[in-house]
């Protein structure tokens, strides 16, 4: 049997043929089978097609940074309709894209304009923000500023925007369901990434590549292989982080393309460890993804405080932010059946490297995934295990095409190295002596102090090991003497007292003294994004504004 490339709807159709009645999407109030979701997403696709959305130009007619398909903005918190919107758009050969609903209206408007959105599917409570973003009133054809609007009732009591169609109404008419186009592996998967990288960028993946490079598929997959995996099923996957970020989407699709049930956590409210653990217990979750210490710490505290049956949970994936060694150890002691998988990757690469920890054995280095490598500092060659040069993480093979509408960034981030198209997301790394890699972080997360380079994540890890420190971030700020100085922003545990000097000595006892912070700022709360990722913009601003709590470098 000849292997073939796959679009995501084609894979899901194979899974649905094998297990139509299996739960596919589950939330606190909704439970839908694979067959139900296939019907609903076909109806949504037909609705989008009737309103003119679809493919404009085929992939072979376009350059790497160009999109020839209609785009659909998804402005929602986690819910089954989020993934149904994505799959429905794929079936229409349109391209869904994530919008961070925490953005200000100006930022949302800029993103919709940048991507060229033709439709917006939104939670009703976010409707006023969407309307403000586009700044126009409804038109007779039911569009705002030319946008097709579909609203999802989130129970907020907020009225839909004028001219908007409710999600159930969009699905009510099955006209055109049997005339849908056949999605292509060349159809796009678009991830809009921002966070620590600044202005949002649209990362363009082919679906055939994202299926293998980010969603757990394989180059050798045939229909029989996919069907065989689907019959067994992948268990129950819990996507706890927000789907408005690529990592959670890929967790969800990795579960779905392997025939699993995906459980969604309502992220419209603050992180609730008790609700998370109750969900694991109720749904018998087998695999869950989290984002670093921001998720791990409250989970550990809640497991210690109350009794839960978490014996079904055998795998915990963590990425997007550092999970400290102490918290991993606590999770493994509390849940001895657990395997903790630290993942490293980016929107520009998919999963690149993994470290696996079990009870009694913690991984301290990453092992490279297929296609992942370390590039030399000058980006001219691939390093080999044994080289001690600090270079760049890189990936070849199943990687994105480029950045939407940005030729310059596309050619910078996806260069040719040794004749191979390569993704270089911007993280520094080196090989370890045993062939693993040590990821050192982005150049933007490096403080150059007195000619020495300090990778902030390394210092943050040590700070979080202190028993009195709840959370910490490290940044650089200008220094007349050293060019830059290391600044630690520290959140103490309730009731704890700690002097800046003792914080510095704690770091200096485990790392080179030049890596210890010259300034320590005690903060009531560390700034983090909704995903749990560090808010370094907040941290740098706080460091620049502070004029006290400086200790002398020795």
Regions found by a protein language model. Give the residues of each.
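Conserved AMP-binding A3 loop
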Residues: 33-35, 188-216
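Conserved pre-ATP/AMP-binding loop-to-beta segment of ANL
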Residues: 20, 171-192, 198-199, 227-237
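Structural core segment of the AMP-binding/adenylate-forming
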Residues: 91-172
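AMP-binding/adenylate-forming catalytic core of the ANL superfamily
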Residues: 103, 120-122, 281, 288, ...
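Conserved ATP/PPi-binding loop(s) of AMP-dependent carboxylate-activating enzymes
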Residues: 380-415, 452-454
């Amino acid at each position: 049997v000849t292997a073939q490339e796959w679009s995501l709807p084609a894979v899901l159709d194979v899974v649905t043929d094998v297990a139509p009645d299996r739960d596919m999407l589950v939330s606190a109030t909704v439970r839908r089978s694979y067959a139900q979701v296939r019907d609903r997403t076909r109806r949504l696709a037909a609705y989008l097609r009737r309103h003119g959305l679809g493919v404009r130009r085929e992939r072979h007619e376009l350059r790497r940074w160009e999109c020839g398909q209609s785009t659909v903005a998804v402005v929602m918190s986690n819910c089954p309709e989020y993934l149904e919107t994505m799959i429905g758009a794929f079936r229409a050969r349109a391209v869904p894209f994530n919008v961070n609903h925490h953005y200000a209206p100006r930022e949302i408007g800029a993103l919709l304009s940048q991507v060229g959105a033709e439709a917006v599917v939104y939670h009703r409570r976010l409707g006023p923000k969407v309307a403000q973003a586009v700044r126009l009133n409804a038109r007779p054809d039911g569009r705002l500023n030319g946008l097709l609007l579909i609203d999802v009732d989130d129970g907020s009591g907020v009225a839909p925007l004028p001219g908007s169609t409710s999600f159930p109404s969009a699905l009510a008419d099955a006209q055109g369901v049997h005339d849908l186009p056949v999605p292509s592996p060349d159809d796009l998967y678009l991830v809009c990434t921002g966070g620590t990288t600044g202005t949002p960028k649209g990362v363009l993946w082919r679906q055939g590549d994202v299926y293998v490079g980010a969603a757990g598929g394989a180059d050798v997959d045939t229909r029989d292989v996919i069907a065989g995996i689907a019959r067994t099923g992948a268990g129950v996957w819990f996507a706890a982080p927000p789907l408005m970020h690529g990592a959670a989407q890929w967790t969800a699709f990795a579960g779905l393309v392997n025939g699993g049930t995906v459980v969604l956590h309502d992220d419209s409210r603050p992180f609730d460890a008790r609700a998370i653990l109750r969900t694991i217990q109720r749904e018998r979750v087998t695999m869950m993804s989290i984002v670093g210490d921001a998720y791990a710490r409250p989970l550990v505290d809640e497991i210690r405080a109350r009794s839960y049956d978490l014996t079904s949970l055998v795998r915990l994936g963590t990425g997007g932010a550092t999970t400290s060694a102490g918290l991993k150890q606590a999770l493994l002691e509390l849940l001895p059946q657990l395997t903790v998988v630290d993942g490293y990757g980016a929107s520009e690469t998919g999963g690149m490297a993994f470290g696996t920890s079990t009870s009694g054995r913690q991984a301290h280095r990453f092992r490279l995934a297929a296609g992942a490598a370390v590039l030399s500092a000058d980006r001219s060659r691939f390093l080999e295990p044994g080289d001690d040069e600090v270079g760049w993480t890189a990936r070849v093979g199943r990687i994105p095409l480029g950045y939407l509408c940005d030729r310059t960034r596309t050619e910078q981030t996806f260069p040719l190295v040794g004749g191979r198209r390569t993704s270089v997301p911007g993280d520094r790394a080196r090989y370890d002596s045993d062939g693993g890699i040590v990821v050192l972080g982005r150049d933007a997360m490096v403080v150059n102090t007195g000619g020495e380079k300090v990778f902030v994540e390394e210092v943050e890890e040590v700070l979080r090991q202190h028993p009195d420190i709840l959370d910490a971030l490290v940044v650089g700020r200008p220094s007349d003497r050293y060019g830059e100085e290391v600044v630690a922003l520290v959140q103490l545990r309730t009731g704890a007292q700690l002097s800046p000097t003792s914080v510095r000595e704690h770091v200096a006892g485990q790392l080179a003294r030049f890596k210890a912070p010259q300034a320590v700022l005690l903060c009531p709360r560390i700034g983090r994004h909704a995903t749990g990722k560090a808010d370094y913009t907040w941290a740098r601003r706080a460091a620049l504004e502070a004029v006290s709590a400086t200790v002398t470098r020795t």
